[in-house]
Amino acid sequence: MRTLLVVSSCVAVLTAGMLGLHALPGLAAANAPDLAGGGPWFNTDGRPVTIASLRGKVVGVEMWTAGCENCLNVLPYMKQWYAKYHGQGFVLVGVHTPEFAHEGKVEYVRAAIARLGIAYPVVMDNDYRIWNAYHNAYWPALYLVDKHGQIRYTHVGEGEYDVTERQIAALLSEKI
């Protein structure tokens, strides 16, 4: 009986990760941590992006790594949302946090960004400073930050793309 309970608990946790979680402890409706401590930056002419500099915009902070299959599966949606909503005030920032040592090399990340056709800003987070500031534990994870710098929505894993897109649109429609 105990074994069945342990197996059932593991399946529930794995399923929650695949389906997406919507609130991670301690961050819902909290001030979004800054993006400090990472680098280098790509698709920004090398200049860092800060949450403070993006006030008045809706920001998606995407935790990913180029070697993660789930991250690659959500990438078409990230690119689609960036293309569709960027002109309306949506900024997407990829935080590339390596799982394995080879994923932390600048050449690897630069080549992955080019190969995958990523046009939005990406920062390397080899020391997990940004990852830890967001209390993140999963790849991929998306944090939506409102125009006032508050985390208003989180999603972990794949799926529920329609829900996430509705959240982006709703946050964009809010007045400052």
Language-model features and meaning:
Residues M1-L4:
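Positively charged n-region of N-terminal signal peptides that target proteins for export
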Residues C10-H22:
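Hydrophobic alpha-helical membrane-insertion segments, chiefly the h-region
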Residues G20-I51:
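N-terminal "domain-start" segment that seeds a small globular fold
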Residues W41, W64-G67, C71, W131, ...:
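Signature tryptophan residues that serve as conserved aromatic anchors
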Residues V49-L72, M78, L92-V93:
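Short active-site neighborhood of thiol/selenol oxidoreductases, capturing the structured segment around
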Residues K57, A112-Y120, M124-A169:
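Thiol/disulfide oxidoreductase modules built on the thioredoxin-like
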Residues L72-L116, N126-N132:
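Structural microenvironment flanking redox-active thiols in thiol-disulfide oxidoreductases
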